[in-house]
């Protein structure tokens, strides 16, 4: 049975780790440090740590892996393979070269498209109709190693980051399970990536979350679902932030971009930079919980038609 070091952090990684524990010998898990979460700043372990602790697997949590004491400990382990999935740090070259079979990564895009830390978000924001999982050998350059296997999956119009995250997490574990035997036996035919076709999906910044109402209705719809349920697209109304969780396109309604042109029992309908509008169905006003627009409108006394979102 192969001795594997697993490196990952968020929920996306847990299905992959659970599969490895069931099928192989995971001798160590490396994840990010515990972080303060919520308004009360409660120190919270990463999801991967909870899985590892449940199975009594040693856990390493370096703030920075390079030149750390944890790195020295990992280098001393006689591992056959390193598997990473959304770890969140680049691996030092010494660690990449340490295992007998090298290091592989489970990446949530069809490489060479969407290298980087936010491939699921960016694929949806860009209006892609499919994405997938790539399993590749790791090299020093970010997400640029030889491709071992890939599997695509359709992005439906109603999908958002949350639904695609879950689908890709399961797909990643499934594809890795199928691919590992050829990696362990060293019988796979990996192929180089074409760097000329590479695109990048950098981590989402705060300024990326704001909606530009001058964009087309389709682009705004993709923007909202490409950031839902995290980190969440937002706009401002009455100089207060308004988070936008779900919406749909209303054909053939137009007006000045960002203007509320109609309200119904269930929606706020906003003009965009195209001939179609956006109907908001789930929002979170500043200082309040996430709610259906129906519930929001039941507490609003004034007419919102004509108000402008910025």
Curated annotation (Swiss-Prot):
Residues given in the record as (6S)-5,6,7,8-tetrahydrofolate binding sites: 109-112
List the keywords (alphabetical).
Answer: Protein biosynthesis, Transferase
Per UniProt, what is one GO molecular function of this protein? methionyl-tRNA formyltransferase activity
Q: Which CDD domains match?
A: FMT_core_Met-tRNA-FMT_N, Met_tRNA_FMT_C
Q: Please write the reaction equations for the catalytic activity of this protein.
A: L-methionyl-tRNA(fMet) + (6R)-10-formyltetrahydrofolate = N-formyl-L-methionyl-tRNA(fMet) + (6S)-5,6,7,8-tetrahydrofolate + H(+)
Query: What Gene3D superfamilies does the entry give?
Result: Formyl transferase, C-terminal domain, Formyl transferase, N-terminal domain
Describe its function: Attaches a formyl group to the free amino group of methionyl-tRNA(fMet). The formyl group appears to play a dual role in the initiator identity of N-formylmethionyl-tRNA by promoting its recognition by IF2 and preventing the misappropriation of this tRNA by the elongation apparatus.
The cross-references to PANTHER family, in alphabetical order and at most eight, read: METHIONYL-TRNA FORMYLTRANSFERASE (PTHR11138), METHIONYL-TRNA FORMYLTRANSFERASE, MITOCHONDRIAL (PTHR11138:SF5)
The family annotation for this protein states:
Belongs to the Fmt family.
The name of this protein is Methionyl-tRNA formyltransferase
Lineage of the species this protein comes from: Bacteria, Bacillati, Bacillota, Bacilli, Bacillales
